[in-house]
Regions:
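Helix-to-loop junction immediately C-terminal to a conserved catalytic motif
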Residues: 53
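H-loop (His-switch) and adjacent beta-strand-loop-beta switch element
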Residues: 205-220
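Conserved ABC ATPase signature
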Residues: 135-139, 143
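Conserved ABC transporter NBD signature motif
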Residues: 61-75
Length: 263
């Protein structure tokens, strides 16, 4: 019996007001896929994630997450935002942040001994067991990212969505982030957004290119010509090493300015 797609978009369109961001989008993400969503600023990347999470509703078309509507399957998806802010005057431990993935959508709530045990195990899973009692606001960018990934994992999701996990860490720490993502169970579907093509090529197997429409390609087929055909001159692929091909993204300043805010 063929398993249902982890995520299925069928002729999905969405816009903010009069501006259409996504137009008749069709694609499937299979269970266990490791994919990245790329595209120019304003192209619809974050909008795509919000539609998967059920935070936005499409203007037309249908979205299914493991065969059900996104609203019914929110517990099956773990979400890692770009950043999470707390008032430094009000102390919040790393363990408290992870527990949010167990006690519901509110910031705080009752947690059982089993919840705390699972939260500690999730921190250990991402290699940060020693941070449980540390104040979240005092952690480095990479440590915060690890804690947020642990928060997403503690609910035992079937898929995990990461919105630009490499955006707020030093370039030298990206290898550490890739190692962190390798801690994720192989049966979990991984969907991440990134602007850094070097990180994309070394981390995922399939790329979803978004610019109103959606094009899906294996990472190995991602070329400069293909990117330019999809996005114009905003992204450029650079091969650094024939033995270990990588890539970098370069944004045309005027193109970024023309795109306006990021969606």
């Amino acid at each position: 019996m063929t398993s249902l797609p982890a995520v299925c978009f069928q002729r999905v369109s969405f816009g903010y007001g009069a501006g259409e961001v996504l137009s008749e989008v069709d694609f499937d993400i299979l269970p266990g896929d490791n994919v990245c969503v790329v595209g120019p600023n304003g192209g619809g990347k974050t909008t795509l994630l919000k539609l998967m999470l059920g935070l936005l509703k499409p203007d037309s078309g249908q979205i299914r997450v493991f065969g059900e509507s996104p609203e019914k399957m929110q517990g099956a998806l773990g979400y890692v935002p770009q950043h999470m802010h707390f008032d430094p005057v009000f102390p919040v431990r790393a363990l408290d942040v992870v527990l949010m993935g167990r006690v519901g959508r509110g910031s705080f709530g009752f947690s059982s001994r089993e919840d705390r045990k699972r939260a500690e195990a999730a921190l250990d899973q991402v290699g940060q067991a020693g941070l449980a009692q540390a104040q979240f606001t005092e952690l480095s960018g990479g440590q915060r990212q690890a804690v947020l990934i642990a928060r997403a994992l503690v609910g035992s999701p079937r898929a995990i969505l990461l919105d630009e996990p490499d955006a707020h860490i030093d370039p030298g720490r990206r290898d550490k982030l890739k190692q962190l993502l390798d801690y994720l169970p192989t049966d979990i579907t991984r969907i991440l957004v990134s602007h850094n093509m070097d990180f994309v090529v070394s981390s995922v197997e399939k790329v979803i290119c978004v610019h109103r429409h959606v094009h899906v390609h294996p990472t190995s087929e991602l070329t400069t010509e293909r990117i330019r055909n999809l996005f114009g001159s905003e992204l450029r692929l650079v091969r650094h090493d024939r033995e270990h091909p990588t890539a970098s993204a370069h944004h045309h300043p005027q193109a970024d300015a023309d795109q306006g805010g990021q969606y």
